[in-house]
């Protein structure tokens, strides 16, 4: 089983992770291609295409300009935000981290797909950003889908578990994916209606990755046995390809 999650805008490069050795990212040449485009933009252009403040545009202009000399950190330690905070990566053992290294991919606008211990540098590039007519979803789709197929070919349980947002999971081409895609949904029962509450769903995605790591889970079936921040599996609302977890 291979799990995908979205990268985060929030980064934490202040504290370094000392318990792991960094690995090399999967698509360095394609990352460099995007970097060349990003380095050609002025601060005003970055502010416009990324829809960010001039202050953030200045920070990212400086990052891209001197990218190779920026500090590196393992991806799973470098990202912050609701998903990553609930993985509780700082509490994972080396054995659990090594398990995630072969069972988790972090989807990124700049790096495409990252193994948890792949080295990354500080950056900002959301998957929905357009660079000189480059659609990042299209740019990455074939490469990432082919890579996932190759990885799952070596797995005993050949499932792709989708814990990424719509914007990021769209880099997987379902028509070219050779194996079963399983989507995860976290919903809340509010006055008899099932709704997805974005921030709570993000936290639950992180909690599920934590459970996968703690229990070395390699099958979607086993995920049904655990609660995730109050969300519990609902057989009534689920199918083989859509697993629904509900908080009452």
Swiss-Prot record:
Domain of life: Bacteria
Biological-process GO terms, alphabetical: response to hydroperoxide
Gene Ontology terms: cellular component: cytosol
Cystine crosslinks: none
Family, per entry: Belongs to the UPF0246 family.
Protein name as it appears in the record: UPF0246 protein RF_0769
Source species of the chain: Rickettsia felis (strain ATCC VR-1525 / URRWXCal2)
């Amino acid at each position: 089983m291979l799990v995908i999650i979205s990268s985060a805008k929030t980064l934490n490069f202040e504290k370094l992770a000392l318990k792991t050795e960094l690995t090399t990212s999967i698509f360095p040449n394609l990352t460099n291609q995007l970097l060349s485009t990003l380095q050609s933009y002025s601060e005003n252009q970055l502010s416009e295409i990324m829809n960010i403040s001039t202050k953030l545009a200045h920070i990212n202009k400086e990052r891209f300009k001197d990218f190779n000399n920026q500090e590196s950190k393992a991806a799973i330690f470098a990202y912050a935000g609701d998903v990553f905070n609930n993985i509780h990566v700082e509490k994972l053992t080396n054995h659990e981290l090594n398990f995630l290294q072969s069972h988790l991919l972090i989807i990124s606008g700049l790096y495409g797909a990252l193994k948890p211990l792949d080295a990354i540098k500080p950056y900002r590039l959301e998957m929905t950003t357009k660079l000189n007519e480059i659609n990042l979803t299209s740019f990455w789709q074939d490469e990432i889908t082919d890579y996932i197929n190759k990885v799952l070919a070596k797995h005993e349980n050949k499932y792709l578990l989708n814990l990424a947002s719509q914007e990021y999971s769209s880099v997987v081409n379902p028509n070219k994916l050779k194996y079963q895609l399983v989507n995860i949904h976290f919903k809340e029962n509010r006055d008899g209606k099932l709704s997805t509450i974005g921030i709570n769903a993000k936290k639950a995605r992180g909690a599920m990755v934590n459970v996968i790591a703690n229990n070395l889970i390699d099958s979607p079936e086993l995920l049904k046995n655990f609660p995730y921040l109050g969300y519990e599996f609902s057989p009534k609302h689920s199918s083989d390809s859509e697993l629904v977890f509900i908080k009452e």
